[in-house]
């Protein structure tokens, strides 16, 4: 927070002016005898620096209520490292914004260097081999701070189902991948760490979800569940008046101070030292709902090794004007920094930084030179530890929501707070470290299918990508189809159908558990004679278990295979049945608001786990 002399109440007593009680707001004047000495000094100071409105009507409140509010203000002061200093910092941010000054004024922008990794190329295969060798030395950090209300799901977003074929939640899906990585690539007797970043609203739902489901097979000791202890106050105008709840004058509504606070929290909890003792080399930060979150990992590790990166962002192609954050390289005074810029300010920043056309330029393929940020990053643990030790993990803050410049002294349309962003760890690196920041550039169909919007077409829709739970589910099915076709399997293309106004091809819907296929090379090992594998466009196929081999298959219907550890399943032959069908549904009738459901008419189920024979053949 800076090198300032301080006291328990967060201001400097030797510069505190003495003034008579008569100068205090009426509500505070008649409450001083109820407060401790520290609380009295704090409230006086708040009154003097333009926050006297906090105490309006205090004289009408019961004594116990005023005492409790005094306790709350004192606690808030300590958590913020001095509420007065916090207010002054907020005023500086607001003054700069009102003056039209971006934090990036004086910087030059340029597109990051990109080289697209494509399936089928030699480097793609080599990247997978190299990356897989290090996957067991990765600790995973999930950003699960979001509720799903903005996408029509009234719970923690990480609890949303990835697909309706298996009804697997994102949280379970991620744990499945981590456990598969641990088994395949982990060190003997070492568990891969899984850190879950939560918010005030998602902590309990996620904690209970894990407990109720026995942590989905993961050992509780390898899961760290973090939540910030400090929310930050909001402000109502350019003079930085603290927002007071109009319906309850004893409440100062606050919000989480952005996911950037987790770097400081990871530092405070000493997790980096614990992970280092486990032999961890990298931290993989990823967001709460991306059905392809783990597909990019080996390629990111490879790129980090190849280019000697200490911080590596995952990026995908992006169209100009697309409402996704973008990766931008900024330079000033011989200092370079790679940042993930929010789409709301991207156009403005680019114009400030010499790109006069802003976010409208594109290449011959119609894509912006500034690729989309996926909020996924791979950090070298040794570098991360040094950065946290040096900075405490404190990041620059920005205004959220951005107030209108036309409002000036009037109240903002909605209260504004100062927040920090998890991905801005790049801004506190040393210059020599900042020079070792880059991106792994992949096609979205292999790396990025997030849930960010409601499941419906809108009047604003153009040719921009739509990121919702429907498209994320369909992207997962399509990913498996693409890989099977790439190795020579014959997989029919499904018919395009409309769901909630979106034209999609969900069929055939294929779900392969990470224990079955974790990497592209696994598909080649499991499907031993690809030309002998045919899957019709109406088919459904679900497979779990490492020891499942498919030598030949003609599938027209639904096949589900579940193979426990120590057993083997070989698939060969022809299967035809009524199958499962994805059909349109009233979006209001399903908890997932997807606009379709799975009609489970008929299936062939193979389970290997309790039979006398270790081998089952279809």
Predicted regions and their residues:
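N-terminal regions that are enriched for targeting/export leaders
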Residues: 145-147
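Domain-scale recognition of functional cores that engage charged ligands
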Residues: 114-139, 150-420, 425-426
